[in-house]
């Protein structure tokens, strides 16, 4: 499973002009299930996202996670957006191949599982809409952008 994390001051996602998800300071997480992924990869990716220390402490060092933005237990937002294009293979030719992305039904099942698990352990979760044509608006903080990948099975 692949995740692309962006530390944001704020972010929102729109579908057909309607805001379907919005957060203040936190993480925008673009996620993609790959062929062979299961709940195990989703669990590992979520655990890594929530614990990754990419928010600054008082000294300006990246020592805080989205679960503790201020050192006092204040959680940041987590905006989760599905994006199968993260599985693109661009090695040959000029048109990317997406054969490594999970089939739509499996991708949606794992996305829904990932979101449900996130909501079970994190108080501020917003989402996009699976397979929708979305417009994602964000204000990068830093910028800090990190790719994560948990290898399939």
UniProtKB/Swiss-Prot annotation:
Q: What domain of life? A: Bacteria
Alphabetical UniProt keywords: Cytoplasm, Hydrolase, RNA-binding, tRNA-binding
Record localization: Cytoplasm
Q: Which Gene3D superfamilies match?
A: D-tyrosyl-tRNA(Tyr) deacylase (3.50.80.10)
Pfam families listed in its UniProt record:
Tyr_Deacylase
> Subunit composition?
Homodimer.
Q: What PANTHER family has UniProt attached to this entry?
A: D-AMINOACYL-TRNA DEACYLASE 1, D-TYROSYL-TRNA TYR DEACYLASE
What's the protein here called? Answer: D-aminoacyl-tRNA deacylase
Q: Which organism is it from?
A: Acidovorax ebreus (strain TPSY) (Diaphorobacter sp. (strain TPSY))
